[in-house]
Amino acid sequence: MQTKERIDYIKNWICDYCKSMPKEPDSLVIGISGGIDSSVTSAICALTEKKVIVLSMPIKQLKEQHKLSLQHQEWLKSKFKNVQSHLINLDEVFKSFEVSLSAFSNEHGFANSRARLRMTTLYQVAAANNGIVVGTGNKVEDFGVGFYTKYGDGGVDISPIADCKKSQIWQMGKELKILQNIIKAQPTDGLWDDGRDDASQLGMSYQELELAMEDKNSENYKKYLEIRKRNLHKMKPVPVCKMKNE
């Protein structure tokens, strides 16, 4: 599938899904991080001509990450009249959360809590606007290595780009003319004070992960399987205790 065709296909899929719902939503609600995935997803959503609400939700965010988020919001609004943007600073809410749970302090847990707080915010905004929450995860993250927060950025209503590889996301970004500084930025989940990028957390770049997913003979295939095994619980349905003979 060519890049433009892929964009149109995703756009039409979003429209068809909304029409298939018992009550068609009035809006599409998306969290904007300043990264390529959320930038591409929000731009494709805007192409549907439905009302699109994009949220920037900084929590102890690095200035450069937050700047990219705001720049994309402005770019999006300059291109599409159906886009609304909001800055919802969650710093104080998160600080209160950290204080309340100081007896249970855990760095990794608090990092994931940032994503879960953003998810809660997205759903509140969606509820107030008869909207649905649109996910921004790609195929490598969502179905390859499970690189997302359980019930955080993984908690969405639809996942339009979850069957697209990271390389395809970058191609769509270029086709959509997403800002160059976003296309060139190092991918990061934005959950850590030190601004660590995705590659440093995964131990591989997205290009290496894609190759490992597609080629069992690649040098990183074993490492890919190890990461996948660790995170498989995120990608599987919640285990249910089935009663015998019932």
Where on the chain are the PLM-derived regions?
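Phosphate-binding/switch loop-helix module in NTP-utilizing enzymes
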Residues: 118-122
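Conserved G/P- and acidic residue-centered "switch" motifs that form tight phosphate/ATP-binding loops
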Residues: 35
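ATP/NTP-dependent adenylation/nucleotidyl-transfer catalytic domains that generate, transfer
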Residues: 2-30, 43-53, 60-61, 72, ...
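Extended, folded domain segments that form the structural surfaces/walls around functional sites
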Residues: 38, 57-60
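Short, surface-exposed alpha-helical segments at coil->helix boundaries
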Residues: 38, 42, 66-70
